[in-house]
Amino acid sequence: MTSVKRAVVFSGGGAKGGYQIGAWKALREIGFEPDLVTGTSVGALNGALMALGKYEDARSIWENMSMNRVFSQFVEDTQAQNLPPETLFKRLAREVLRNGGADISPLQELVKSLMDEDALRHSPIRFGLVTTRFSPIKAVELFIEEIPEGEAADYVLASAACFPFMKSYQIGNVKFVDGGYSDNMPVQMAVNAGATEVAVVDI
């Protein structure tokens, strides 16, 4: 008799990542306990939090998410001028063009504060993500045991580097961009890892 291996797959989806928490809640309610979770972009962040068992943290993040928590001093400066949203976004677009992507330092700090790498490596839920190596473009699929020690948070951020809106994310000498450029819904990654039942959360 073939043993069942359950997986959850979180797609990329940017600001819609909060909807994945609703799906996570539903999976908890029906008792769907995954053996592994894979994710791309914002799905990599939510997937890591699932592997860590941080449902309440994930829910709190998305309930309180605002531009201030994603972008840097740029938002504080423009909001202090009491600008309408249309003007704010136009200025943000100009910053993206001028600087090669928006500065998302607050988001980076938030992700790094949440990533308990030791717990992630020893979680009963195996975690995997997709990112994209930049220039030349190449898909990169990694499970937690393949990620170098001390770089788990960096690879989650690399998976979510929504270039060109955000800057590419550099790890060592290599630049990465959003995993959605390679595989926005890493179902096959889960199947290749032995998943026989897959819950796909596509937003």
Spans of model-derived segments:
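Patatin-like phospholipase
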Residues: 1-40, 48-203
